[in-house]
Every structure is written in structure tokens, then in C-alpha cells.
């Protein structure tokens, strides 16, 4: 397959899909390819011995158990680095993963998968092209990238297509014979896309992880989308009615609103450690069969708290789309829906949320306080005219609200505040 064969817009697995897999690892690339993603991205820097290492950052600090500059490593020391996969992703991946050399990527994926390669260090473009030529990789199967116009010129002079990153300068790109521009999402408009297409230039936008944003950009006319969650952005593949927390699988659309959370192998749950703020994660993989009438069932457990029983809570936010919900910030523009809270003292609260701002609708009287380390079954039902929020188990209590202000609200976010909170057995029907 060549880039010319792809229907537009297509999705590029940014860093291999960094929200689902350990970024820029061979293991992560294999998952991306196994998911049917046609394009994987690499960030390539020159090493001290002239080798080429694949890593986004200029240091190894964030991604490995070591520290120091990428450029100070040789090819040998590069392969001795340990990717801190479990800590970075919150579980689900083993230790002992290694950052790849670009040669390894070409041996396994060259001419098999479409590659989108950024020359990350200022001296990387020429050796990247040399490596591609040496391995006999077809130029039709590669898009190079750079923010530097000089590097883009070099790529074009060697016969390779290139994305000029960070620009909307269509006139200059056309004059340089550059076939792609790569602006950030906030700089893309329908006018930019129209000007680019009129000049024979395509638009690759970065980095897009939410479907509401994707839909606007597709309507604007973009040709390619870089995404850290490429399966979620590409379509409905991977959507399901229940979680896979027990298998420690990061499903498509499991995106941090304010935090990522982590898996707990001891009981097959996922959740947040105690924190002096509110944290929340989108569960974009959940998809009800009928968005107009949904029932969400889950088990919630509260662990250590750092506030009183009225302040500490676990919560569910049901929203109209996948705008992030950031309850501890000054607001969450675009976040509309309903907030369901279980407080440490046992109170159930329901709020209507408009542009991220909650307004109380109803509360139960304080019931039996939550017992630390004990799961509580919860059920939320949304009909065309109302909401039911039920706590089961030893305490059977329901809050009923007549409100139809937001419909449908099929998008699930899970969170907690001032407490360690775990969730499991999440089912949306």
C-alpha cells in the first residue's frame, strides 16, 4: 500500500498510539499494526555513534528508568535503556521494553506499513533518508516530517514527500514543492484547507484525540489526522458495552480528562490514588445500543481519603459528547450532561452540568457511610424524561430526578475527588 492509496482523511498512529501503548516501542507498533492501522509515526534522533534512535523527547528521562540526553547514547547503550511502561501507562504492560533503533523499525515494518517519520534532531533528516534508501524502502510508503524548512527542502531534493510541520503558509510550501503542511489543530480552518487544496497541498493536523474535535476538522477538510488514540479517532472499532479492567487493557477512548488512573491487579479494577483534587477519565470505549435510553451499572470502592466524608467522593459524569470534564479547573467548555456523586458519608447527589459548571438537582439524605475497601453497586438509568441514581448492596437507596435538559448522554466519564477510588464491572446498556 502507498499513501496515494489511502482514502482521505486517514489517521496516523502518533508515536504508535501513545495513549494505548508504550510510545515508540516495537511492541507498541505491533499492536497498532495488529489493530489494522495503516500508518505509524516515528520520531528519530541521531545518536553519538551516528546511529538513529526512536524517541519523542530530547532526553530519556520521561520514558525510561534512566536520565540524560538522547544524543549522548550510542546504539549499544540505547538498547540497554529500560522503558518505564507500567509506570507511564498505569499498568497493563511489562517492564524490560527497549527503545528501538530506526534500523529495527525499517527491518520489521519497511514496505509493510506506511511510515510517517519526523527528523527530530536537527541533523537527522539526511541519515534518515540514507537508512530508507539503504533498506530499499519505497518513497511512496513514507512521509517524512520536519518543522525546519531547510530539512523539508533536503527531503524534497532527495525525492521524498514531506510534511512541513507547524505552518499554514500554503504559498511558501507550494513554491518549495512541498506537498503537505502539518499545522496544530487550533490553527486549522476550512479556509486553510481550501487554500491548501487549491495549491495541490494536503493538510495533516496534529494532535487530535477527541471525536468532537475530529468531526470539526474533518468538516474543515483535513486529509490526515495524527492521534495518540488512533483506533478511537478512526471510527467505532473497539467500542463495547463493558470494561476490560481485569485484563489491564487500555481500550480505545480511555482518555484522561484530568488524570489517567491505573489498574489494580489484586481485584481487577481501575481507578485513582488519593489526591487533593478531583480527577476524571473518559471511558470512550463504552457504547450503548440505544443512546436515547441507557442504564449504567458499576461497582465503586473508596479507599484512603484526604478530606471529610462530605467532600471525598467518587463520581460518574454522563455527557453529550467527549469534551473533557475537568472539575477542578475553572471550567470545562463544551462539557454538558449530568454528574452523579457518591460521597464518603453515603449521600447521593445529582447535578446538571452546563459548560462544565454543575448545578444541583437532587440529593439523598446521608445514608450509610461508605466503608473503606468495600465495593458499592451503583446503577444510573436515563430515560427520555428523567434520571434514576441507585445505590444497592446493604443500602438500597434511589434518587429520582425529572429532567430532560440534556439528551442523549451516552458518553461516560469516571472520577474521584479527595479519595482513592476504584471502579470495576462497568456495564453500559
Which residues fall in each region the model found?
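Phosphate-group recognition and catalysis centered on beta-loop-alpha active-site segments
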Residues: 1-265, 292-294, 385-388
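Short beta-strand micro-motifs enriched in acidic
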Residues: 45-49, 341-345, 381-383
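Short beta-strand segments enriched in hydrophobic/aromatic residues
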Residues: 46, 121, 300-304, 319, ...
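Short tryptophan-centered beta-strand motifs in secreted/extracellular beta-sheet-rich domains
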Residues: 203, 298, 371-391
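Secretory/extracellular carbohydrate-interaction modules
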Residues: 273-351
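Short, aromatic/His-centered strand-loop micro-motif at the edge of beta-sheets
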Residues: 352-377
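Flexible glycan-contacting loops in extracellular carbohydrate-active proteins
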Residues: 399-425
